[in-house]
From Swiss-Prot:
Transmembrane regions listed in the UniProt entry: 105-125, 142-162, 184-204, 218-238
Subunit structure: Homomer. Forms protein aggregates. The two isoforms can interact with each other and with themselves. High sequence similarity is required for their interaction.
Compositionally skewed regions (Basic and acidic residues) per UniProt: 1-29
Organism: Schizosaccharomyces pombe (Fission yeast)
Protein's name in the database: Meiotic driver wtf35
Length: 280
């Protein structure tokens, strides 16, 4: 076996540059690596200790907080190699994957039940005022009560099932209504005039119907009239004069259309009279 002798001109610095490592002057140069058995390691190498090996790798690549990429996040989903890579999205901390925006049970029940109370309050107050609350009821009266209870149940069911929808709609309507508060006095005056003009036919109908049917007709026309008054008040507050303006526009539109047709029929001039040279 031949001995390998290094020439005298080769210095320790040149060996360090050649091997790309720093040589410990006390321990000497690194021994040669035997590729056949692969077991030869430097006697003073830190790789003999696995813990130090991990620390050296960390120091080598400088894995610390200062060199962490800004877009890296432990909560991001891993990128797969199948097909198109999905975008980096944060994981949601919801068990069902959807947010629950529903209102609390008690508030939902209270508001839905309040709508039924407001629906039944006028009828109950009127019956108590007439001292006819569950007194001397016949088949027709009990049929009407049953129909009223069924209507209340249907209203409560819809109020409960579509709670989120109708509460948002009512909230937006109230906000829009409050923006038009300057129109409220005029709308109230128009509703008052509406009650005066329609009040006399209601009184006549109650007298014509008689005592037996007077209660039902009076109750029905009171409810219908109250609803109409509320609708007129809302419409005239949000858009004053909208109903009257629409009627006037239609009348003006019909008159203008008739006048236009009349002008076209009697004042149209033939083209040959306008251009007599065209005949020649």
């Amino acid at each position: 076996m031949k001995n390998k002798d290094y020439p005298l001109r080769t210095s320790m610095d040149e060996l360090s540059t050649k091997n790309d490592n720093e040589i410990d002057l006390e321990k000497g140069p690194l021994p040669e690596y035997n590729s056949e058995d692969g077991s030869t390691l430097p006697p003073y190498s830190d790789l003999n200790n696995p813990k130090q090996m991990g620390q050296n790798i960390t120091k080598l690549f400088n894995w610390n907080k200062s060199t962490t990429p800004p877009d890296y996040d432990e909560n991001r989903l891993p990128i797969t190699d199948e097909g198109n890579n999905p975008p980096n999205t944060h994981r949601e901390n919801h068990s069902s994957g959807t947010t629950d925006n529903s209102s609390p049970f008690l508030i939902k029940l209270l508001i839905s039940f309040t709508s039924i109370i407001l629906f039944n309050a006028p009828a109950v107050c009127y019956l108590k005022y007439k001292d006819a609350f569950f007194k001397n009821y016949g088949a027709a009266e009990w049929t009407l009560i049953g129909f009223w209870c069924a209507s209340s149940l249907i209203i409560f069911t819809f109020s409960w099932y579509f709670y989120e929808t109708w509460t948002k709609a009512v909230g937006k309507g109230i906000k829009h209504f409050l923006k038009k508060w300057r129109n409220i006095p005029m709308a109230f005056s128009e509703v008052f005039l509406f009650n005066i003009l329609v009040g006399s036919p209601r009184v006549a109908l109650r007298h014509i119907s008689g005592e037996r049917w007077g209660l039902k007709c009076s109750l029905a026309d009171h409810i219908i009239f109250a609803i109409l008054s509320i609708l007129v008040f809302i419409v005239e507050t949000v858009e004053p004069g909208s109903s009257k303006i629409n009627i006037m526009k239609r009348l003006r539109g019909d008159n203008a259309r008739d006048a236009t047709q009349h002008v076209n029929e009697y004042t149209a001039v033939p083209l040959r009279e306008m251009n007599p040279e065209s005949e020649a």
